[in-house]
Amino acid sequence: MRERQKGVWQMSLAMLISGSIGAFVLLSGLPVTEVVFWRCLIGAIALFIFIRMSRKPFSPLTRITLLLAILGGIALVVNWLLLFAAYERISIGLSTVVYNTQPFMLVLMGMLFGERVSLVKWGWLFLAFGGVVILLSTELTGARGADWLAGIGLALAAAFFYALTALITRKLKSIAPQHIAFIQVLTGVAMLLPFARMPSFSGDFPWPVLLTLGIVHTGIMYQLLYSAIQKLPTPITGSLSFIYPVVAIIVDNLVFGNSLNLTQLAGGALILFAAAGNNLGWGEKKPRQCGVGIKTAN
């Protein structure tokens, strides 16, 4: 019971941290590629320190598992680039709600590999699709501009690449999660190094924001997340993961004054309700592992 309680607060804290990342991305004032590069570099250093402090040997890697981890890292970094670009075009809250379609992306991907999808999951999938349609309804009636629609598209694309990351990570069960994250952010450093510029050490360079993104939102957050997943059953981690979009919407309102209108709230509520039903296995006849093996954290 004590381990479960520890897992609950670790998961809750991880989701609270994750919900504030959008604000730090925008407050940095840097191009998306630079924000992601520094997040990867500082995050890699933080994760390396945590791994060394754990005194556990690094998971053995074969050529195939290393390649899969790198491919997962590419997908994860592309996901960050797309999501952070969405923040610049639409509100953080709306981006986050659309981003929570990712479990359904994973369901559809699983079908390509022969995984059976129950009628109940199809029901949740169509309900989430209905939520997306409602979110888009203001655009379909001409009330929004092309930049708004681009933001929605970027958030959906980010969800796709996060789901792809989760699908690849499923194949890496022999590797400790912290070690997977370390390889992934190192991959991000290599990917984005050509686009990085020398930092300024003057007072106008956002070092406090970047250090927070790397240490807190990457190193500490992933350490808490993976530790919680090891302690908690899937239904609890699935339910606690919905702290993330709620916090993102609240932070967006407090920091930038953005709020969802009634139509967006209705569409977002449908998406989050469908994602909860999918993750927690609502309506399934037989006891089974809930959800699709994805924990929402960016």
Feature roles, as predicted:
Residues 34, 41-45, 84-115, 158, ...:
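Specific alpha-helical transmembrane segments that line the substrate/conduction pathway
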